[in-house]
Amino acid sequence: MTDCEFGYIYRLAQDYLQCVLQIPQPGSGPSKTSRVLQNVAFSVQKEVEKNLKSCLDNVNVVSVDTARTLFNQVMEKEFEDGIINWGRIVTIFAFEGILIKKLLRQQIAPDVDTYKEISYFVAEFIMNNTGEWIRQNGGWENGFVKKFEPKSGWMTFLEVTGKICEMLSLLKQYC
């Protein structure tokens, strides 16, 4: 992927964490792609946090390095079968949101730019592991947005529900 593509993904990751942390976004706000992603990923994140509360309570994320290590372990398991789809990509963002909330609760000295550091390694993972697939499947606007816009209906709901179940079973391995 190009630097431009990395920048786009990095912006999506930052926008999502700003949404999770309720940080106001200057200017015209997030793009349409970012808004669609926020809606879908936030739904997944809330479901995972609700269903795995006791498990997540036992996970300690005290630094960005700890968050990066845990993120890489979970993503390695998530993608070990080589299958990539939009639902799995959404779970990356949902997990990013879970990590930032855990980190900001447990970090000794939270940094105002912590969300940017998390967004950076998330964007690197997406770029390095799913970038080609994203391109081949219409990109963010012609692939992701068309699939997950609210008008997509039941199929999107069922796919996301399936991804929630997958993420729940993956995270249970770490508790």
UniProtKB/Swiss-Prot annotation:
Position of motif BH2? 132-147
InterPro entries per UniProt? Bcl-2-like_sf, Bcl-2_BH1-3, Bcl-2_fam, Bcl2-like, Bcl2_BH1_motif_CS, Bcl2_BH2_motif_CS, Bcl2A1
Concerning Pfam families, the annotation shows: Bcl-2
Please, one GO biological process term?
negative regulation of apoptotic process
Q: Any idea where this protein resides?
A: Cytoplasm
Q: BH1: where is this motif? A: 77-97
Its domain of life?
A: Eukaryota
Against CDD domains, the record matches this protein to: Bcl-2_like
Tissue distribution is: Seems to be restricted to the hematopoietic compartment. Expressed in peripheral blood, spleen, and bone marrow, at moderate levels in lung, small intestine and testis, at a minimal levels in other tissues. Also found in vascular smooth muscle cells and hematopoietic malignancies.
Question: What keywords tag this UniProt record?
Answer: Apoptosis, Cytoplasm
Q: Which PANTHER family match?
A: BCL-2 RELATED (PTHR11256), BCL-2-RELATED PROTEIN A1 (PTHR11256:SF10)
Subunit composition and interactions: Interacts directly with BAK1, BID, BMF and BBC3. Interacts directly with BCL2L11/BIM. Interacts with BAX isoform Sigma. Interacts directly with PMAIP1. Interacts with RTL10/BOP. Interacts with ING4. Interacts with UBQLN4.
Name the family the entry cites: Belongs to the Bcl-2 family.
* Name this polypeptide is given: Bcl-2-related protein A1
User: Which organism encodes this protein?
Assistant: Homo sapiens
Q: Which gene encodes it?
A: BCL2A1
